[in-house]
Curated annotation (Swiss-Prot):
Keyword terms, alphabetized: Sporulation
The name this protein goes by in its record: Small, acid-soluble spore protein N
Ranges annotated as biased composition (Basic residues): 1-12
Region Disordered, residue ranges: 1-47
UniProt gene name: sspN
GO cellular component: endospore-forming forespore
InterPro entries, per database record: SASP_SspN (IPR012612)
A Pfam family hit: SspN
Biological processes, Gene Ontology terms: asexual sporulation; sporulation resulting in formation of a cellular spore
Compartmental location: Spore core
Induction entry: Expressed only in the forespore compartment of sporulating cells.
Protein family: Belongs to the SspN family.
Compositionally biased region (Polar residues): 29-47
Length: 47
């Protein structure tokens, strides 16, 4: 089956977790690679 849109590369699924994300707008890379740092916890409700 041919792709009618032509110049498409092989389809790469863009689901969450399939590709490493660079940090910038999306902080996924920072959260995964903490290198010994504690995660920053933002408290939204008093507990």
């Amino acid at each position: 089956m041919s792709n009618p849109k032509g110049s498409r590369k092989h389809f790469v699924p863009n689901h969450i977790g399939t590709q490493p994300r660079a940090a910038g707008g999306n902080k996924g890379k920072q959260m995964q690679d903490q290198s010994g740092q504690h995660a920053q916890v933002i408290q939204t409700k008093g507990e």
